[in-house]
Design a protein with these regions (language model features):
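Short, structured surface patches at the beginning of a domain
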Residues: 1-132
Length: 132
């Protein structure tokens, strides 16, 4: 039997992203993530939203709160709409995906990018991170 996943839904929108309109809005991200969680039987333990924060900055308040919940054992799965919503700084992205999450047993899912650490990330993830 698969372990139950206590899932954090992570959403982020920077001021620069606002020019893209509804396609990346917090509400759009929430709808996509909630639907995915329901369809995949993921137990949502919280929503973590950093509205107005750049993806190059990993000191975002709700990102840090989510990582504290990871450390406390409350979260063992993180889902974001895509890799760019999680972050836009490729060195830190690689750090989390290659070191932090595997060490802590965290499943990460980038829904729209069809990336899931449980299935193994594609070889294109480092390149996507470079160009996010």
């Amino acid at each position: 039997m698969k372990q139950p996943y206590n899932t954090a839904l992570y959403m982020r929108l920077s001021r620069d992203d606002e020019s893209y309109g509804d396609s990346v809005s917090i509400e759009t991200q929430r709808t996509i993530l909630r639907r995915f969680a329901e369809e995949n039987n993921l137990h949502v333990v919280g929503e973590y939203i950093d509205d107005g924060w750049s993806g190059t900055n990993f000191d975002r308040p709700n990102f840090q709160r989510m990582m504290q919940d990871v450390e406390a054992g409350k979260v063992n799965c993180i889902a974001s709409k895509d890799l760019s919503r999680f972050g836009r700084e490729h060195i830190m992205m690689d750090y989390y995906l290659e070191f932090v999450f595997p060490e802590k047993g965290i499943r990460y899912i980038a829904v729209s990018d069809n990336e899931d650490t449980e299935k193994g990330l594609s070889d294109f993830v480092p390149f996507k991170n470079l160009f996010n």
